[in-house]
Amino acid sequence: IKYGDSSMVAYLFTDLFGRMNYMIQGVHSSRGRGNKAALFQPMFLVEFEGIEQPQARMHRMKEVRSLTPLSSLPFDVRKSTISLFMAEVLYRLVRESEANEPLFDFVCRSVVQLDRMTEGVSNFHLWFLVQLSAYLGFYPGNEPIPNGYFDIRGGVFTPSVPAHRICMDASCSGLLGDLMDCEADRLGSLPLSRTQRSAFMESMLLFFGYHLDAIRTVRSVSILREIF
């Protein structure tokens, strides 16, 4: 977020402190060395030196550099759209200012996997949501059941529609099982239509929203639907 004429405010998910808010000065200045602003695109991996200010909501960043150069994500509209979605989801869900190393490592791996993918890109955001649920504490509690249904309220697969009827339909339930068992580099083996992706996204956001109110409205979903 631009702040003043030459500064910006950035929301970062860090390895040591979880979510942190930083003020970066001179990022838009013509006198600065290099284009710092380019490093703060959604889901870019950076290494930086910061000045922590106890009890403050905003901290200051001294030096910043690219940690892992991304070769395709900034230039592929499909990947950059997915990275925007990932960033928004994490912004809404990760509120803690404390370390969460497993989640941090998963997010970093996911960014690198997306950048290197050549097949299955259109399914990556669906896979990311499914895998993310494991790090947020509500991954499906049992193995998929053939021709079964996923109980959104209970968080488990059932052989029939639960009495409360808050569940994924059979098609989305089957896809959930497929994505639970699928590695990112095999996403190209799932031939999904635009309608299937949209329906599954709706089901997953309903599942997330049932457990976490913060995810109920994700603005970047509309952009995903236009592209995928």
Task: Enumerate the language-model features and the residues they cover.
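Non-catalytic alpha-helical scaffolds and adjoining flexible linkers that form interface surfaces
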Residues: I1-F228
